[in-house]
Amino acid sequence: MRRLEWKFMKRALILTKGRNYSMNASIEMMRNIGVVAHIDAGKTTLTERLLFLSGELRRMGDVDSGSTVTDFLEVERERGITVQSAIVSLPWKEHRINLIDTPGHVDFGVEVQRCVRVLDGLLVVLDGSAGVQAQTLTVWRQAAKYSLPSLFLVNKMDKPQADFAMSISSIEDKLGLRALPVVIPFSRETALEGFIDLVEGRCLKLSKGKNSEWMTIETKSCEFDVFSEGKENMCFGLSDSDQSFSSLFLDKYQGDTSKVSREDITQALRRVSLSRSACVVSSGSALRSASSVRPCLDLICNLLPSPVNSSKLVKESIGNHFSGLLFKIIHDKRRGRIGYTRVYSGELKGGSHLWNWTRGEKEGPIELFEAQSDSLDPIKSAKEGSIVAVRGLEKSLTGDAFIALDCDKRSFPEEDPASHIVFDG
């Protein structure tokens, strides 16, 4: 069997079919998130685990064997590193999450910069034995330019050298942020035992291997003391970062953590995440236990913003007409030149012509595809907030802005619509 035929057959065996579960999700239920990290922090393995947990994959691939969904180039599979960004979509509790897995090597920083421009939030992955590293700092500066809310995952906590406290300190010292741990590791002597979710009041024990599942922490369990101390630290940290929560927790509840509800904590965590007044930190070991990174999916949906605000900014200028930004161009072996585009307002329809506002040229007719890494599925239209693959933009370049042909050409914002977005709850 020819190599190309085997590639597509293998992909069909791995990816699940019938992905209409959340493709029609409202804009409020969308999340456009980038996964960023320094090289070898476990970013691609994390993405693979999230796809599996969501039901998008029948089985998980492995970076070392070259079988992951998002590292599909030959050089990526051979070297075990991400060279170019890959886009995947997955469902989680009525939400549609569009994830962009970005390169972690400093040599491909431009690729990351192009993607950050069209995102609404970031999931920053740290190696638990190294904390914040060079590429982490670079990406953080880019995120600050667009005021992107961010979550952190301290990964690889099963490594002998892993140090969660050191990783937290590196976030606060190098990025100048207050770190709020919400999923913490717990150990027996020096061995990692599992993880505790301080928001949900549950724990995951790694001793049960691949069958490990999150279980509610009982008051008589040996994990309860670790949970109680961790929740208290989290609540006092939140009080220092959010005035509303401070009034509730310190004044109304007199610092009693048992009176604070999950909803109280989640709403406060969302406020500090959107305002970037603090950063929420989870922990896990994506390679050893897929379940350990399950809280990341809940945190993405509960704490990070939808595309509503960025769409609202553009609509103030051009109403409900289509507008979009081309942020990545690839050459697909089967379909030729493909442009990845973020839809900021209106609806993008297959077969239509567009006006390249940046260059003053007409483009089209276009074909639309939903991208799942290197797999492109034809679709008829894409609504605002979507990230979509477009064929037919033959004269356009990365960074070009598009509007509908019937839109007033003078009304498009002079500045990049992502430049001055302020997120609210």
Regions found by a protein language model. Give the residues of each.
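Structural and coupling elements of P-loop NTPases
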Residues: R2-G425
